[in-house]
Every structure is written in structure tokens, then in C-alpha cells.
């Protein structure tokens, strides 16, 4: 029994890195949110990437408070164009396009002093399905570490983002 378990664990330690080799994962921050991304490079030029982002904001005015929580989950296709200049680390320019589903939850709180009756609390949740596209540059900082600077367009919103990506 112990030998069988040893063989299973040894197989897992050799199999998992083999299937994870082309994958990459990273963290991304932009103007008002933070998130994670996971990708699969199809070849040197093309990749498929999934991402998840979350942001929270709070607005207060005249006793009225609105808390907004947004989450986005999406998938994009990426086309990268490797570049090389003299005396500069290798980098790539990329364009991307895809789909994102965004969920916004707004919680409004109005105190008794503003309503002159009882306090008012309400939560509204909305969903949007939107096209996302953008572009930017990636710089290989180390063998398995890449830095990314990009500009994304989601609906009528633009966001400048910065990401650190680890390639397995």
C-alpha cells in the first residue's frame, strides 16, 4: 500500500509541472481595481487569458452613504508581437480583445436625519456583458517573470493597468 501511494505521489510531482508548463498567472492593478489573471499561450504569438477583478468604493454626502462593489470576470484573446532593440531587454507589444461580465452592487444608506422618518437601506445589483479590448507592452524581467503595462477599453471606460506575470 505504501509503495502504491509513493508511486502516485511521485507521478503527481512529475505530471503536474509537465501540464502546467505553458501556463502563466499574475496579478493586475488598474485605476480603481485589483485582480488576478491566468493564461495559456497557444504559441509565441497568441494566448488565451481569463481574468477576475474586484473594486470597492464609498461615497458620502449630506449623510447619505453609497457603497459600491464591482466584480468583473472575463476572457480575452491576445496577439503579441515580439520586439528587439539594440541594448534593450526583449519586449513585446500586444493587442487583446474579448468579453467581460461585470456585476455592480450598490448599497445606499440614508439616516433618519435625512428622511425625517425611519432609516432607509437598499441594495441594487446589476450585471453588464461588455466587449473588452486594449493593448500595451510586456517586458521580460527574468526567466519566468514578466511585467505588463496596458490600456483597456471596457464599454465607455478606459483603464491603465500594471501587471506582474509568472510563467510556469
Question: Predicted regions span which residues?
Answer:
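Cleavable N-terminal export/targeting peptides
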Residues: 1-22
Amino acid at each position: 500500500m505504501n509503495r502504491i501511494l509513493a508511486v502516485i505521489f511521485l507521478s503527481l510531482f512529475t505530471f503536474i509541472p509537465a501540464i502546467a508548463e505553458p501556463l502563466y498567472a499574475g496579478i493586475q492593478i488598474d485605476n480603481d481595481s485589483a485582480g488576478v489573471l491566468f493564461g495559456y499561450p497557444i504559441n509565441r504569438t497568441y494566448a488565451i487569458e481569463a481574468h477576475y477583478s474586484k473594486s470597492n468604493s464609498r461615497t458620502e454626502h449630506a449623510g447619505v452613504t453609497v457603497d459600491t462593489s464591482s466584480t468583473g470576470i472575463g476572457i480575452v484573446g491576445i496577439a503579441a508581437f515580439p520586439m528587439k532593440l539594440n541594448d534593450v531587454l526583449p519586449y513585446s507589444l500586444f493587442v487583446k480583445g474579448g468579453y467581460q461580465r461585470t456585476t455592480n452592487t450598490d448599497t445606499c444608506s440614508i439616516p433618519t436625519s435625512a428622511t425625517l422618518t425611519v432609516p432607509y437601506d437598499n441594495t441594487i445589483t446589476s450585471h453588464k456583458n461588455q466587449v473588452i479590448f486594449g493593448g500595451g507592452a510586456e517586458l521580460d524581467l527574468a526567466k519566468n517573470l514578466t511585467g505588463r503595462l496596458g490600456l483597456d477599453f471596457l464599454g465607455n471606460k478606459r483603464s491603465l493597468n500594471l501587471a506582474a506575470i509568472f510563467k510556469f
